[in-house]
Amino acid sequence: MLCVLGLSFAGFLTGGAPLKGGLAACLGLLLGSVGSAPADAVNRYTFDQLYLIDGIPLVGVALGIFGIAEIIDLLAKGGQIAERIGLGHGWLQGVKDVVQHWGIVVRGSLIGVWAGILPGIGATAGSWMAYGHVVAMAPDRERFGKGDIRGVIGPESANNSVEAGDFIPTLLFSVPGGAPAAILLGALYFYGIQPGPRMVQENLDLIFTIIWSFAIANTMGAALCLFLSPALARLTWIPFARLAPAIVVTIFFGAFQSSQHFGDIYAMLGLGLLGWLMKQLAWPRAPLLVGFVLTKPTEQYLWLSISRYGMEWLLRPGVIVLGLLLLASILWIVLGKRGGKNLPAEESTEGAVILGKVPSVLFTLSVFLVAAAALYEARSFPYLGAIFPMAATIPAIFMAVAQVVLDVRAAGGAPGIETRQKSKLALGYFFSLVLFLLLILLFGFGIATALFTFGFLNGWVKMRWFPALLYTGVVVGLTVLLSWLLGLYWPQGIVLEQ
């Protein structure tokens, strides 16, 4: 129930579109259900593809939903990311903002500690839960998603406290909550140190050393960021189209390294297009990622609860209290006691609907069809493998029906000429990324990087050939150097393999 409550923070309590947030969270749960079921010997939604048996990697989902989608959107808008403003003189104001919103710092930190204690949740979900909580508690929401400092303070407070919370199960019970804690646990085992109650008795000094090292590292990291932030912020003055090739190459290379399979890039591009559509239609994307991250711990805890108590676990006092809290939170938003006054119903933290009424209705209908098809497919799974997808798809179907009604009744018409032009431009940039993938499949990552970078700069940016060649050489050289230093594998093309 704690995981479900976390989903509500990121889904129903994000912005003024609770149904869209809930649907996005259910989509994330459904994406996370792809692959081998942890509680039964069944492969779900794999379509006979070996790649999908282990599920879709988190890296591909995050880079697609946010990275690729934002790249396409920024390229379509054109220009630079930020205006030229004075930098390096806002540190004192930042301190004042933190002091002014000290309550957000405390609540965000507590959410982060809780996310760290629960295995499998981690910093990503904890940060978005904190963001959803801040948005839900704010009396005015118009500025969220547009630079409101409260939307930075809450998630960063949670992000900084997640690892601290992760120390509790890791050091006391040998149960890591995430990848960093697992690495720490492995290092302790390597030196013959057994985390657990005995460690508290025999190696208490080491525990305090770890805690102080973490605190000092955070302080030094913050100081370094303050020192470098003016120089790094000036990158936002550069026209984004000039930065895009290097960013795209980095994202493609990073996505491939998660499992070293081309399926990672396929998934990233597909989810990137989905993320762009969600942004244009004012669907919050954060709940989808949080739902995906929470799928594994939620299903594991559900399986354990059913295995131990049957369906009677729903009648336990703690579950009832959390369920009532969840229901009250949802009703609070849906009935408009807090949320409906300040943010239009069709608007979320992603902004207003851009593509118009008809695409919005069609997109919601597509979500309905996906949920219905997933529910029908789940009927063929064994009980323990089917209960979680059903728990995700049944609410999604009802919410999709309600959202279709809202979309049909909402005011709005066809998008304007400028919107249609930007949409066509965005699709053109997306197909450029697809072309990059095809080049990788044919010639391998190195040659494809050179061809894509030079072609993008020469075609889209209209950069002269000599600076474009120099830029291309730097990108390829840095990629080669990084691969050599870290021992990373380059995807090979069909032509080079023959």
Regions found by a protein language model. Give the residues of each.
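Membrane-embedded alpha-helical modules
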Residues: 1-79, 190-325, 334-335
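Long, contiguous bundles of hydrophobic transmembrane helices that form the permeation core
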Residues: 26, 42-47, 73-100, 336-363, ...
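Alpha-helical transmembrane segments of multipass membrane proteins
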Residues: 32, 69, 119, 123, ...
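Hydrophobic, small-residue-rich transmembrane alpha-helices and their short perimembrane loops
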Residues: 103-198, 205-213
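Flexible extramembrane loops and terminal tails that flank transmembrane helices
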Residues: 318, 333, 338-441, 462-498
